[in-house]
Amino acid sequence: MRCNFKGLTLTELLIASFIFLLCTSTVISVWLCVRKIYTVDITTIDSRRELRTALHRMNSDFKMAETIYTGRSFIYKGRTYQIPPDPLYPGSPGYSIAVAIPVIDSDGIRSGNYTITGYFLEGQSNPDKYNPGAQQLVRFCYNTTGGTQANPVNPLSVNLQTVITSSDTNFTVLAHYIEPQGLEFTVFDPPRGIKTAAVKVERKLANLPPVQQKIESGYFMRNNR
């Protein structure tokens, strides 16, 4: 018995439908595999580029800085951040740092105000299943007011807690996927007056083979002012 459907027999229609479904499933499977590979590779590349960009940004801030704050602390979202050196543990690293950068006007003259810039780690805004305990590097920026060329602001008088809680402070996430203990700030103040800050960053990638799971880079920043 023949069953015609627009010129096709029932058998031919079933065969055509099977071939169509097979081709469709194959295309979808290939697309999903390629998408997964592409996502993993791009994520890895972007994280490294993001980290390099963040470290260069930090280095630029420290080069322009006139003051590196030491022995300070502040509270952000219920967590206390200690800026080294800790009075209780001299020489120990911290997980935050802040500097004061003089504001220069369009004529290249100091305005008397400062940009207070700092960095710290906090939990990820969007947790990643591959790195559930990962942290993100945050940069905060605040501009002082009221300073003049004749009567400039004293950067050492700035209260970092006030800076953190001010509505005028901008917070920017510069790097994601940093291990909880993967970033350390160490501030040195030798007799010759050169202040330096050493940063160590380490990240584990759960989506790479064990031998490649750890990305570690050291960065040494110096301020000669």
Language-model-detected regions and their locations in the chain:
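N-terminal secretory signal peptides that target proteins for export/translocation
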Residues: 1-3
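Aliphatic-rich helix starts adjacent to a transmembrane/signal segment
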Residues: 5-64
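Short, glycine/small-hydrophobic-rich surface segments
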Residues: 62-101
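Type IV pilin-like appendage domain
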Residues: 86-188
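Short acidic, glycine-rich loop/turn motifs
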Residues: 101-106, 201-207
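Low-complexity, S/T/G/P-rich flexible repeat/linker segments used as non-globular hinges
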Residues: 144-150, 202-225
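A short hydrophobic beta-strand element
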Residues: 193-202
